[in-house]
Amino acid sequence: MARYQPVHGATFLTLLQMRQTLLFLPCFLICLFARAADTPPNIVMIISDDHLWSDYGFMGHPHIKTPSLDKLAGESLTFRRGYVPSSLCCPSLASIITGLYPHQHRVTSNDPPIPAGMKPGAFHSSPLFEEGREVMSKHLESAGTLPQRLSAKGYLSLQTGKWWLKHFSRGGFTHGMTKGGRHGDSGLDIGRKTMQPIYDFIGEATQQQKPFLVWYAPMMPHDPHTPPKRLLDKYIDKAPSLPVAKYWAMVEWFDETCGALLKHLDEKGLRENTIVVYVSDNGWITNPKTGRYAEKSKQSQYDGGLRSPIMLRWPAKVQPRMSDELATSLDFAPTLLKAAGLEPTKEMPGLNLLDGTAISARKTIYGECFTHNFVDLNVPASSLKWRWMVDGYTKLIVPNKANQPDDSVELYDLKADPSEEKNLAADQAAKVTEMTAKLDAWWKP
């Protein structure tokens, strides 16, 4: 009997330990799942540059091939009627990263005001140019940015590509490529020459077990339109001119880089809890003769400059679907902050794209277009060219007579006239009055 005592004693201790373990296990699992649920998602922001809203396979272009973006659209909550508030690079990008209208963040234009009598080339190399850019950068810092706000949740953030406002750190990024050049300096290598800085950053953030934000804003398909010959050859016989073929090939080249980035996320096992958002900073229509932008595109008050598909992919949380509801790039900041467990600021006018009720209830969006160079760095209204709004499928454009003295009010039915050819303002005066009252209630400078 005695020789079995140690065995009985060990069995008793084992059962006691098992009982304690079983009692502890639910608490452990609850904590584990709570921690997993509290893990903020990674964020990848893909922002194309000078890209017309219809120039994608999934948006119906008959020739341009965009298989990676088509796939992303099919995996995302995709808004076919997305807009940016301004059709110019710098203010549009500033709105994406702040969640504010240009008149709110005050970065309304690409460059500081040119002194009377000074040529642009001389101005860009003068101390006045850098002094003006410093004011612009301070405006952005005062407004607050997405990377700054996400740092409260421990995010590491990387800037690549287009960046107008001096050193990347001025935007709150912890990592970056742009050191202060006008619109990106070495950051402009991303996409065209390399994707490695993004891959290295993702590896570093993953190793540190930190959530991350990637700002992928390559200068693509923006000119210079220098696509690889293998892509250009695909479009030479399909496009109406060589400049158009070059632009089409640039779009496919950009699409390839997006595919490489998304593939990298998959290979690293980051797909499920990484939010990928997409928008273009503004539109573009190629002048078939010159290769520059045509009317009604970049820098204009028309959909050719303002409209862009907007996508949000989050496999762990979001069911893919195509939507014809209105969306705006101003929605990114509140959406991503909420996803990270943070509250949007009261100044942010955008909606959470994941709040289906709010998105369905919204019928109107607003925007504003400004001069390429500031008129006054501290007075947004001084640089204003047009205010605009879309109410359902009706679009109103109101010029600022101080800068556009020859322009008239414009009203379009976007469903019947998506290229905005027939101005209905003279025939629908009551509608113009009704919508102008809404526009003035939004912002009347």
Describe the function of each predicted region.
Residues 100-199, 295-297:
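Catalytic-site neighborhoods of secreted/periplasmic enzymes
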Residues 64, 264-321, 328:
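Histidine-centered active-site microenvironments of extracellular/periplasmic hydrolases
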Residues 284-290, 296-297, 318, 330-333, ...:
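C-terminal cap/loop subdomain of S1 sulfatases and analogous C-terminal strand-loop tails that border
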Residues 37-80, 86, 419-430:
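Active-site-proximal N-terminal segment of extracellular/periplasmic enzymes that hydrolyze or transfer
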Residues 61-93, 99-104, 156-158, 436, ...:
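Short, structured active-site-proximal loop/turn typified by the sulfatase FGly-forming signature C/S-X-P-X-R
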Residues 43-44, 49, 150, 162, ...:
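A short aromatic-rich beta-strand->coil structural motif
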Residues 195-202, 233-274, 339, 441:
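A long, amphipathic alpha-helix that forms part
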Residues 198-247, 282-295, 430:
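Active-site His/acidic residue clusters
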